Amino acid sequence: MKFIYKLLFILSIVLFLFNNIITINGEIEEVEEINDECSGVRCDKVDKLLCLTSHRPVARYIDRKMAKEKNVLLCCPICLIPSTSFCNHSTSSLHDPKLKYLSGNVYTCYDGEKECNLHTNECEILPQYR
């Protein structure tokens, strides 16, 4: 009987922790996170060999702990995209569904005349600079 109570207790804690993250239809809600690993990242500064990049929004705490134990960084996953001209200034998935779980801003446009085109996620000379 004690086993059943322990199981119910653990189950209630798990449900409580994930209550605000997972909706009824199984989608992950967009939650604003100010100080996460994608906030203000400049991808060219990241040593990809020192990154733990398999983090998941639902398990961010677990991944942070794992990164600390392995003495590696928890890096923004967008930095793994090989394109040097890839950029994203958006915090939503409106322009690219693959960016759905990113928060913060990622900049890879360093040329003063180029800005991030949110429709193509490429660094381009936008009309205001022509």
Swiss-Prot record:
This is Uncharacterized protein DDB_G0286225. Residues 1-26 form the signal peptide. It is found in: Secreted. Keywords: Glycoprotein, Secreted, Signal. Its main location: secreted. GO terms for cellular component: extracellular region. Glycans are attached at residue 88.
